Amino acid sequence: MRAAIGTLIVATSIVQLANGFFGTFFSLRVAVEGFDATLAGLVLSSYFAGFTLGAVRSDRIIARIGHIRAYAAFGGLVGAATVVMPLLVDPYAWMALRAVVGFGCAGLFVATESWLNAKAPPAMRGRVFAIYMVGTFVALAAGQLLIGGIDVTASGPFNAIAALFALALVMVSFTRAEPPQVSRAPQMPFREIAQAAPIAVAGCALSGLIAGAFYALVPAWMQGAGIVRETIALFMFAAVAGGLAFQVPVGRLSDRLDRRHVVAALGVGLAAVAVALVFLPRSLPVVLPVAALLGGFMSTLYPVSVAHANDRMPPDRVVAVSSALILLSGIGSVAGPLIGTQLMVGFDINGVLYLMAGAALLLAVLAVGRSLLRAPPAHRARTFEVLTPQAAPLAHDAGGHDETPLAGSDRADDRAARRS
């Protein structure tokens, strides 16, 4: 059992290595092609659109055909779309193909995480998902470092990415882990969340907008500004590594304080760092620590917002709540590159940084305002979890049963069992 679980985690880390590399490489490649600003924004946001759709719909495919065949189907979609892209260098074709990649990646994560959740022993589940998330962040960060030694204009990077996805598919196909039975996730309660935890709604949507604009547009701008790819790779690596470093301390802080105050502080910090990047000297020793801070603030807005929603919602709604918040974050991620590319026409990269700062400050103001109107909950059924909507977890629940609801997140029952 442990070997099978390890295989699933390693396979997902390989997927994230490919995904982290693909995201930054594709941003650079779109910049090289010189598409119109609006078309470039649509192409860069199409991955997030596909990912969002996959996060909320792939459970139907998994429930219909089972985990292994669904994983093979999703992996095949991603690999095929990736290989075709250098053969069809057209913005409209790339929009469709990149959306297919996003949908397939979401399906891979949902299949893997629901499988892990159902099969990991309850006493080990927390450790399993901790290792899973660390592997996710490390692989995403390592993927950025691959940018330094590639020819952006060649088809080789597309082939290498497809090969990594194929390797993950082969590993999962040979696993001996028995796939779980699955059931449908309940309907997403948008109105309930908006009434119970409006800051969670705003936080997930705005954090998606901020992250989408950053990861899609900043690498492309850096290349256009004549910055060498090795420096781009280090900058993006620092941002992802900062996101990992912030998870535990911010999580502990949010478990002790009103989470809305933590959201407000993160928003102010992110805005300050984004504006600082406008004025600071753009030398590597100065920019790398700032990139790590930016990544830290940016990567913790979403999980704190999700934790705030879980504080306000009944335990039996957590799976549906998580799915709804992923969708909201995805909508924000689609909007980020679209708005950012238009701002870059008039303000260059400063437009993107001001967009990020403005969205973060708006969230901070909303969080402070709500905290003045409503007291925090007296009891919290859940603690902070390391989450990112473009990575994981998308599909683990609390029950430890073989019949696993998909497209959400809930480990409360496991924690309650350990406390009793």
Identify what each model region corresponds to.
Residues 180-190, 370-420:
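Intrinsic disorder in cytosolic terminal tails and internal cytosolic loops
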Residues 107-120, 299-313:
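Intracellular juxtamembrane helix-capping segments at the cytosolic ends
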Residues 69-83, 162, 261-275, 357:
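Structural signature of the two symmetry-related core transmembrane helices
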Residues 1-48, 200-203, 212-221, 225:
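Helix-loop boundary and gating motifs at the non-cytosolic
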Residues 147-148, 160-182, 363-374:
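C-terminal membrane-cytosol helix-exit motif in multi-pass small-molecule transporters
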Residues 37-38, 122-132, 229-230, 313-325:
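Loop-to-transmembrane helix entry/capping segments in MFS-fold secondary transporters
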Residues 99-134:
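Cytoplasmic helix-loop-helix junction between adjacent transmembrane helices
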Residues 54-66, 151, 246-258, 344-345:
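Helix-to-loop junctions at the C-terminal end of transmembrane segments
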